[in-house]
C-alpha cells in the first residue's frame, strides 16, 4: 500500500497490489499514463514521491524478507541496487553532468561492494560491453554522449550489482529498435 497523505486527506495510490515473481520470470505492468506503474516500482524500492509513503501494514517480501520495516539507510545500503534496482523512465537525465560516467558508476559500486580498483574497472567495462558501449565511455561526461548512450549507461548501472529484481520503467525509450532488442534480451 502506498498512500499520499495530504492536507485534503489520504489518497490511496496503491492499495492491495500483489504479485509474485520467481527467479528468471518477467512481469509487465501495462496501463494508461498515471495509472500507477511507476508508483508501483517506487513503492518496491520504498522511494515514493512526497507526501507518499509505503504504509506500515504493507509487505514487500524480497527473498523471504519483508523490507517495509527496514530503515531508509538499511534500504539504501542493503536493498537498493543489490536486491532491487530500477531503471527510471527518462533515466538518461539521472546522470550528474559534472562527473564522468566512470566516477558515477564507481560511486554506486563503492557504496555497495568492496573491490579493488582493477575489479571495479573490469566490472564497469564488462557491463558497458553488455549494453554495446566501449570502455572509453567511462572517461566521458554525460553531455558527450547521445541520449541512447546515456540510457545504456544507466541500464548497465542497474545491472552490475546483479540484483534479484530489476524494475525497468520504459527503459528503451531513447534507443533504436536494434539496440532495444539487445537490451530486452539481457
How would you label these PLM feature ranges?
Residues 2-16, 47-53, 71-76, 98, ...:
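A short, flexible loop at the N-terminus of ABC-type nucleotide-binding domains that lies
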Residues 55-66:
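Conserved ABC transporter NBD signature motif
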Residues 66, 107, 118-136:
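Conserved ABC ATPase "signature" region
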Residues 141-145, 149:
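Conserved ABC ATPase signature
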Residues 160-164:
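A short, proline-enriched helix->beta-strand linker immediately N-terminal to the Walker B motif
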Residues 66-85, 103, 111:
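ABC ATPase NBD coupling module
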Residues 30-31:
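The feature captures the beta-strand-to-loop junction immediately N-terminal to the Walker
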